[in-house]
Amino acid sequence: MTTIAIIGAGAMGSAVAGRLTQRGARVVTRLEGRSEASCARALTAGMQDASFEDMAAAALVLSIVPPAAAPEVVEELAPLFAMPSPPPLCDANACNPQTKRRLAARVAELGGQMVDGAIIGPPPSDTADPRLYLSGEGAEEIAALTKFGIDARVLKGPLGAAAALKMCYGGINKGGIALTTALLLAAERNGAADDLVAELAVTQKPLLERSRRQIPDMYPKASRWNPEMLEIAGFLEPDDPAAAAIWRALARFYAERARADEAGIELPVLEALLQT
């Protein structure tokens, strides 16, 4: 039986683990120091707690955590990389290419090898199949996940290409959600909300239909989207500082939406508005 190690048992990590176990893989992880909720998700997904010695026998290691935690995972795995012939690490986090290159350099210093990964799409389920894009040396080895029900796709570009794809796609998708949300809120504050929705129903019906799904789904995730917007800003900064400033502002926007979600405001108003 093929063993795959996964670090991260959030919504995506646990769903990926569930898909792998359903298709016949053994999935191991490190539960030491994890929250009670993370441990519960991991066990429900069929993940088994493992030592570094157990993980050394894995075919590969997947890191699926919030972008700010990606460097911590690399340091946590230092004992694994110090072992003879450690499995390759696929960093599948929403980090920009610059961050991925720094992480890969650190993994190499520790004695391991890192492949750049990027997940696009919702967590695996009966109705969803996200794509795992891969780039850099060793990507073909990680693409073997395909036989366990993961849609893994190798890109032609070097390490960082998968991260660039994720940054661009995420910037378009989550940037668009932010713009729509901001202007619906502005219309509500200024007495034009119902009229704006009526106009969208006539001239932008696909946008309105997407917004009815995406905006309610966004608020509980806003705290996680804030650091992703900062990664996109860092990606854009060297070549397009003006564009980078947009995504830094979007990071602040999502931080404010996260606070609004905690307070239980905004979303009820928007949900009522979007259902008219």
Give the ranges of each region predicted by the language model:
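Helical "substrate-binding/catalytic lid" subdomain
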Residues: 165-266
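Rossmann-like NAD(P)-binding element
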Residues: 50-95
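NAD(P)+-binding Rossmann beta1-loop-alpha1 motif at the extreme N-terminus of oxidoreductases
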Residues: 1-56
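Conserved beta-strand segments of alpha/beta enzyme cores
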Residues: 26, 46-48, 88, 113, ...
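Rossmann-fold dinucleotide-binding core
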Residues: 4, 95-174
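Short, basic/aromatic-enriched C-terminal tail that caps enzymatic domains
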Residues: 264-276
